[in-house]
Amino acid sequence: MERTFVMIKPDGVRRGLVGEILARFERKGFRIAALKLMQISQELAERHYAEHREKPFFPGLVRFITSGPVVAMVLEGPGVVAEVRKMMGATHPKDALPGTIRGDFATTIDENVIHGSATLEDAQREIALFFRPEELL
Protein backbone atom coordinates (compact mmCIF):
# COMPACT_ATOMS: atom_id res chain seq x y z
CA MET A 1 0.00 0.00 0.00
CA GLU A 2 1.29 3.46 -0.90
CA ARG A 3 2.42 5.73 1.93
CA THR A 4 3.29 9.41 2.17
CA PHE A 5 4.77 11.72 4.76
CA VAL A 6 2.76 14.76 5.89
CA MET A 7 3.71 17.44 8.37
CA ILE A 8 1.44 20.09 9.83
CA LYS A 9 3.86 22.97 10.28
CA PRO A 10 4.22 25.18 13.38
CA ASP A 11 1.75 27.77 12.05
CA GLY A 12 -0.92 25.09 11.56
CA VAL A 13 -0.38 23.67 15.05
CA ARG A 14 -0.30 27.16 16.62
CA ARG A 15 -3.56 28.13 14.89
CA GLY A 16 -5.41 24.99 16.04
CA LEU A 17 -5.84 23.47 12.57
CA VAL A 18 -4.65 19.93 13.35
CA GLY A 19 -8.13 18.45 13.89
CA GLU A 20 -9.60 19.93 10.72
CA ILE A 21 -6.66 18.81 8.59
CA LEU A 22 -6.72 15.27 10.03
CA ALA A 23 -10.48 15.11 9.45
CA ARG A 24 -10.01 15.98 5.78
CA PHE A 25 -7.56 13.12 5.32
CA GLU A 26 -9.78 10.68 7.20
CA ARG A 27 -12.87 11.70 5.20
CA LYS A 28 -10.86 10.97 2.05
CA GLY A 29 -10.40 7.42 3.35
CA PHE A 30 -6.68 7.54 4.12
CA ARG A 31 -5.41 5.47 7.02
CA ILE A 32 -3.11 7.09 9.57
CA ALA A 33 -0.16 4.68 9.85
CA ALA A 34 1.82 6.89 12.27
CA LEU A 35 1.35 10.25 13.96
CA LYS A 36 3.25 12.29 16.52
CA LEU A 37 3.47 15.80 17.91
CA MET A 38 7.14 16.77 18.02
CA GLN A 39 9.64 19.58 18.16
CA ILE A 40 12.00 19.37 15.17
CA SER A 41 15.68 19.78 16.00
CA GLN A 42 17.98 22.00 13.96
CA GLU A 43 19.77 18.89 12.64
CA LEU A 44 16.57 17.14 11.56
CA ALA A 45 15.31 20.33 9.87
CA GLU A 46 18.56 20.67 7.94
CA ARG A 47 18.44 17.02 6.85
CA HIS A 48 14.76 17.26 5.88
CA TYR A 49 15.31 20.37 3.74
CA ALA A 50 18.83 19.41 2.53
CA GLU A 51 17.94 20.02 -1.15
CA HIS A 52 17.37 23.71 -0.30
CA ARG A 53 20.66 24.16 1.62
CA GLU A 54 22.23 26.51 -0.95
CA LYS A 55 19.09 28.62 -1.48
CA PRO A 56 18.77 32.05 0.15
CA PHE A 57 15.57 31.11 2.01
CA PHE A 58 17.14 28.04 3.73
CA PRO A 59 18.05 29.70 7.08
CA GLY A 60 14.56 31.19 7.42
CA LEU A 61 12.95 27.87 6.52
CA VAL A 62 14.94 26.02 9.18
CA ARG A 63 14.20 28.78 11.73
CA PHE A 64 10.45 28.58 10.98
CA ILE A 65 10.14 24.78 11.03
CA THR A 66 11.94 24.65 14.40
CA SER A 67 9.94 27.58 15.88
CA GLY A 68 7.27 25.38 17.47
CA PRO A 69 5.81 21.90 17.51
CA VAL A 70 4.74 20.11 14.33
CA VAL A 71 2.50 17.11 13.74
CA ALA A 72 4.33 14.50 11.67
CA MET A 73 2.32 11.67 10.16
CA VAL A 74 2.32 8.86 7.66
CA LEU A 75 -0.82 8.40 5.60
CA GLU A 76 -1.60 5.24 3.67
CA GLY A 77 -3.94 4.57 0.76
CA PRO A 78 -4.18 4.16 -2.99
CA GLY A 79 -2.56 7.09 -4.82
CA VAL A 80 -1.99 8.83 -1.49
CA VAL A 81 1.10 10.83 -2.58
CA ALA A 82 -0.63 12.55 -5.50
CA GLU A 83 -3.98 12.89 -3.73
CA VAL A 84 -2.46 14.54 -0.65
CA ARG A 85 -0.57 16.97 -2.91
CA LYS A 86 -3.87 17.86 -4.57
CA MET A 87 -5.63 18.27 -1.22
CA MET A 88 -2.84 20.55 0.06
CA GLY A 89 -3.06 22.95 -2.89
CA ALA A 90 -0.37 25.16 -4.41
CA THR A 91 2.64 26.06 -2.25
CA HIS A 92 1.86 29.78 -2.49
CA PRO A 93 -1.53 30.48 -0.87
CA LYS A 94 -2.44 33.08 -3.52
CA ASP A 95 -2.29 30.26 -6.10
CA ALA A 96 -4.07 27.66 -3.95
CA LEU A 97 -7.68 26.93 -4.81
CA PRO A 98 -10.46 27.34 -2.24
CA GLY A 99 -11.27 23.96 -0.72
CA THR A 100 -7.61 22.98 -0.55
CA ILE A 101 -5.82 23.06 2.80
CA ARG A 102 -3.56 25.94 1.79
CA GLY A 103 -6.34 27.72 -0.06
CA ASP A 104 -8.45 27.67 3.09
CA PHE A 105 -5.82 28.18 5.79
CA ALA A 106 -2.38 29.33 4.56
CA THR A 107 -1.45 32.98 5.00
CA THR A 108 1.95 33.33 3.28
CA ILE A 109 4.32 31.21 1.20
CA ASP A 110 6.57 30.98 4.28
CA GLU A 111 3.76 29.92 6.63
CA ASN A 112 1.70 27.63 4.44
CA VAL A 113 0.44 25.22 7.12
CA ILE A 114 1.44 21.85 5.67
CA HIS A 115 4.13 19.80 3.95
CA GLY A 116 3.56 16.61 1.97
CA SER A 117 6.00 14.40 0.08
CA ALA A 118 6.28 15.28 -3.61
CA THR A 119 7.09 11.74 -4.83
CA LEU A 120 7.09 8.16 -3.58
CA GLU A 121 10.88 8.36 -3.28
CA ASP A 122 10.62 11.55 -1.19
CA ALA A 123 7.96 9.86 0.96
CA GLN A 124 10.23 6.91 1.72
CA ARG A 125 13.14 9.21 2.61
CA GLU A 126 11.02 11.53 4.77
CA ILE A 127 9.23 8.69 6.57
CA ALA A 128 12.63 7.17 7.45
CA LEU A 129 13.85 10.57 8.73
CA PHE A 130 10.91 11.12 11.07
CA PHE A 131 9.81 7.61 12.11
CA ARG A 132 11.49 4.41 13.25
CA PRO A 133 10.11 1.27 11.54
CA GLU A 134 8.43 0.11 14.77
CA GLU A 135 6.43 3.36 14.94
CA LEU A 136 4.61 2.53 11.70
CA LEU A 137 1.38 0.55 12.07
From Swiss-Prot:
The active site is at 115 (pros-phosphohistidine intermediate). GO terms for biological process: CTP biosynthetic process; GTP biosynthetic process; UTP biosynthetic process. This is Nucleoside diphosphate kinase. It comes from the Bacteria. Its cofactor is Mg(2+). PROSITE patterns: NDPK_LIKE. It catalyses: a 2'-deoxyribonucleoside 5'-diphosphate + ATP = a 2'-deoxyribonucleoside 5'-triphosphate + ADP; a ribonucleoside 5'-diphosphate + ATP = a ribonucleoside 5'-triphosphate + ADP. It comes from Thermus thermophilus (strain ATCC 27634 / DSM 579 / HB8). ATP binds at residues 9, 57, 85, 91, 102, 112. HAMAP family: NDP_kinase. Keywords: ATP-binding, Cytoplasm, Kinase, Magnesium, Metal-binding, Nucleotide metabolism, Nucleotide-binding, Phosphoprotein, Transferase. One of its GO terms (cellular component) is cytoplasm. GO terms for molecular function: ATP binding; metal ion binding; nucleoside diphosphate kinase activity. SMART domains: NDK. Major role in the synthesis of nucleoside triphosphates other than ATP. The ATP gamma phosphate is transferred to the NDP beta phosphate via a ping-pong mechanism, using a phosphorylated active-site intermediate.
